[in-house]
């Protein structure tokens, strides 16, 4: 109803907060209606602008958060005026919080829609979303801005089905004197190879991320999602470009579009303007085909809320978050027979860390910033330099107690060391000794492999940095010397 009223009376449509409104307390200007979730750096709320009744989104950020990054986000949003970029209306300081007032997108993020419907997107739906997203990227890149965190969680739909780019917490400005940036920033699984390798990158890094996002929309998760993010960071630059798990399910145009986005050499990668002319995008249907997605997601969210209110008993409340994290089975919608169930896969809700609705989920898919010389401490996802020893599962302790209680049978081979650091690769490559180990011992060793790998990766990273830093310092020293002359 509000949308119709605003359309019939365009003078009452909020474009920007007036100076008078900005000088008032935010509660005098807005009615906060409900919490929507968690965004980068703070909580996001749905609110109503009292003067126009327009619904807006308000991001509330604690002042102790990284103000430099927040100011950068505001500055980038202020400079943007595009139908396909979330609009900025103004900001307030309230007690210890900064309130950023932005355009409200009632459809939610694409990842929210996939999660709530428990179903991936069809090919024509993906094409329509990609078309709007490319228009937003074309605008940003024309303004010499890189988003640097393109993924389904950062593409929002309004109630009409228009896709808009959101969450500029890690976006960067490209200047003439800094044609390529050298900071590793973004979300690991969506990162372009040149971003990971720190060899300098420009706007087409967003195009790689868009290609990964297209796979995410079609299959429910990005490539490498099943493996540890730190391992993915090593695999993305060294492996061939990813593609669909089953390319035969998709049209040739869609597969070709993905291939053009995921070109490892950034100089050969297509731009947003070029991709808008691709047959897969040019034949995309209108935004109206996305409205049923929005309605189905909102219905699912409402049912989920009602079910939660009915079923959660007081003694179960502490386990409610764990129950919500199980989103069941997701149906993958193929392209050749849209009415046939093509494939089932389990979707992990942790894949979307941009906005977690109400329930706080632990995730390993967060936005990552590594080795930024100017913004060294600003990353959302920090690297842990100390190796974490795995907690021993309770079932292992149970079996060990039983073995101690009744005595362990004699073994033909020595008992394996419980210290992972002592586990060596056999020189002859013969692992036949493993057949004499108990299930408990094998499970313990298996559970310790990932922490061992992370520790080794961290050590390699430190060695690389130790070699790299003197070279950077020498280059900087020579530049200063040249300037003095």
UniProtKB/Swiss-Prot annotation:
<keyword id="KW-0547">Nucleotide-binding</keyword>
<dbReference type="GO" id="GO:0106310">
    <property type="term" value="F:protein serine kinase activity"/>
</dbReference>
<protein>
    <recommendedName>
        <fullName>Serine/threonine-protein kinase 4</fullName>
        <ecNumber>2.7.11.1</ecNumber>
    </recommendedName>
</protein>
<dbReference type="Pfam" id="PF11629">
    <property type="entry name" value="Mst1_SARAH"/>
</dbReference>
<keyword id="KW-0067">ATP-binding</keyword>
<dbReference type="InterPro" id="IPR000719">
    <property type="entry name" value="Prot_kinase_dom"/>
</dbReference>
<keyword id="KW-0723">Serine/threonine-protein kinase</keyword>
<dbReference type="InterPro" id="IPR011524">
    <property type="entry name" value="SARAH_dom"/>
</dbReference>
<feature type="domain" description="SARAH">
    <location>
        <begin position="431"/>
        <end position="478"/>
    </location>
</feature>
<comment type="subunit">
    <text>Homodimer; mediated via the coiled-coil region.</text>
</comment>
<dbReference type="GO" id="GO:0051262">
    <property type="term" value="P:protein tetramerization"/>
</dbReference>
<keyword id="KW-0418">Kinase</keyword>
<feature type="modified residue" description="Phosphothreonine; by autocatalysis">
    <location>
        <position position="183"/>
    </location>
</feature>
<feature type="domain" description="Protein kinase">
    <location>
        <begin position="30"/>
        <end position="281"/>
    </location>
</feature>
<keyword id="KW-0597">Phosphoprotein</keyword>
<dbReference type="GO" id="GO:0035329">
    <property type="term" value="P:hippo signaling"/>
</dbReference>
<feature type="site" description="Cleavage; by caspase-3">
    <location>
        <begin position="326"/>
        <end position="327"/>
    </location>
</feature>
<keyword id="KW-0539">Nucleus</keyword>
<dbReference type="GO" id="GO:0005737">
    <property type="term" value="C:cytoplasm"/>
</dbReference>
<feature type="binding site">
    <location>
        <begin position="36"/>
        <end position="44"/>
    </location>
    <ligand>
        <name>ATP</name>
    </ligand>
</feature>
<keyword id="KW-0175">Coiled coil</keyword>
<comment type="similarity">
    <text>Belongs to the protein kinase superfamily. STE Ser/Thr protein kinase family. STE20 subfamily.</text>
</comment>
<dbReference type="GO" id="GO:0005634">
    <property type="term" value="C:nucleus"/>
</dbReference>
<feature type="binding site">
    <location>
        <position position="59"/>
    </location>
    <ligand>
        <name>ATP</name>
    </ligand>
</feature>
<dbReference type="GO" id="GO:0004674">
    <property type="term" value="F:protein serine/threonine kinase activity"/>
</dbReference>
<dbReference type="InterPro" id="IPR011009">
    <property type="entry name" value="Kinase-like_dom_sf"/>
</dbReference>
<dbReference type="Pfam" id="PF00069">
    <property type="entry name" value="Pkinase"/>
</dbReference>
<feature type="active site" description="Proton acceptor">
    <location>
        <position position="149"/>
    </location>
</feature>
<dbReference type="GO" id="GO:0006915">
    <property type="term" value="P:apoptotic process"/>
</dbReference>
<dbReference type="InterPro" id="IPR017441">
    <property type="entry name" value="Protein_kinase_ATP_BS"/>
</dbReference>
<keyword id="KW-0963">Cytoplasm</keyword>
<dbReference type="InterPro" id="IPR024205">
    <property type="entry name" value="Mst1_2_SARAH_domain"/>
</dbReference>
<keyword id="KW-0808">Transferase</keyword>
<dbReference type="InterPro" id="IPR036674">
    <property type="entry name" value="p53_tetramer_sf"/>
</dbReference>
<dbReference type="InterPro" id="IPR050629">
    <property type="entry name" value="STE20/SPS1-PAK"/>
</dbReference>
<feature type="coiled-coil region">
    <location>
        <begin position="287"/>
        <end position="313"/>
    </location>
</feature>
<comment type="function">
    <text>Stress-activated, pro-apoptotic kinase which, following caspase-cleavage, enters the nucleus and induces chromatin condensation followed by internucleosomal DNA fragmentation. Key component of the Hippo signaling pathway which plays a pivotal role in organ size control and tumor suppression by restricting proliferation and promoting apoptosis.</text>
</comment>
<dbReference type="GO" id="GO:0005524">
    <property type="term" value="F:ATP binding"/>
</dbReference>
């Amino acid at each position: 109803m509000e949308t119709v009223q605003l359309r019939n009376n365009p003078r009452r449509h909020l474009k920007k907060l007036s100076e008078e409104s900005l000088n008032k307390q935010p509660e005098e200007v807005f009615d906060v209606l409900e919490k929507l979730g968690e965004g980068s750096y703070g909580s996001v709320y749905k609110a109503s602008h009292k003067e126009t009744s327009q619904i807006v989104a308000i991001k509330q950020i604690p002042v102790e958060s990284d103000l430099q990054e927040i100011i950068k986000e505001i500055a980038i949003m202020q400079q943007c005026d595009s139908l396909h970029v979330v609009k900025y209306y103004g900001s307030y300081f309230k007690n210890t919080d900064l309130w950023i007032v932005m355009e409200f997108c009632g459809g939610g993020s694409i990842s929210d829609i996939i999660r709530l419907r428990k179903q991936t997107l069809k090919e024509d739906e993906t094409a329509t979303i990609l078309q709007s997203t490319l228009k937003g990227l074309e605008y940003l890149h024309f303004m010499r801005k890189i988003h640097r965190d393109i993924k389904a969680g950062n593409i929002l739909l309004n109630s009409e089905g228009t896709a808009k780019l959101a969450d500029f917490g890690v976006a960067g400005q490209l200047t003439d004197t800094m044609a390529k940036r050298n900071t590793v920033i973004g979300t690991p699984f969506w990162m372009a190879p040149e971003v990971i390798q720190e060899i300098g990158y420009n706007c087409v890094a967003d195009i790689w991320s868009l290609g990964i996002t297209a796979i995410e929309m079609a299959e429910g998760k990005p490539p490498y999602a099943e493996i540890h993010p730190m391992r993915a960071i090593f695999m993305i630059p060294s492996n061939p470009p990813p593609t669909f798990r089953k390319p035969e399910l998709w049209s040739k145009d869609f597969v070709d579009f993905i291939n053009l986005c995921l070109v490892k050499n950034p100089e050969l990668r297509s731009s947003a303007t070029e991709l808008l002319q691709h047959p897969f995008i040019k034949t995309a249907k209108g935004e109206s085909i996305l409205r049923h997605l929005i309605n189905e997601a909102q219905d699912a969210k409402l049912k989920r809320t009602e079910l939660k209110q009915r079923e959660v008993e007081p003694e179960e409340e502490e386990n409610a978050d764990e129950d919500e994290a199980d989103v069941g089975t997701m149906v993958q919608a193929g392209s050749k027979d849209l009415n046939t169930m093509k494939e089932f896969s389990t979707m992990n809700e942790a894949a979307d860390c941009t906005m977690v609705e109400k329930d706080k989920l632990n995730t390993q898919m967060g936005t990552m910033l590594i080795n930024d010389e100017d913004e060294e401490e600003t990353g959302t996802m920090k690297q842990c330099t100390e190796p974490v020893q795995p907690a021993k599962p309770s079932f292992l302790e149970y079996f060990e107690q039983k073995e101690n209680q009744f005595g362990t049978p004699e073994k033909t081979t020595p008992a394996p060391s419980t210290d992972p650091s002592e586990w060596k690769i056999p020189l002859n490559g013969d692992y036949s000794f493993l057949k004499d180990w108990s299930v408990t011992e094998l499970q313990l060793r298996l559970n310790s492999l990932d922490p061992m790998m992370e520790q080794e990766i961290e050590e390699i990273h430190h060695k690389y940095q130790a070699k790299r830093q003197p070279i950077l310092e020498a280059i900087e020293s020579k530049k200063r010397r040249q300037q003095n002359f």
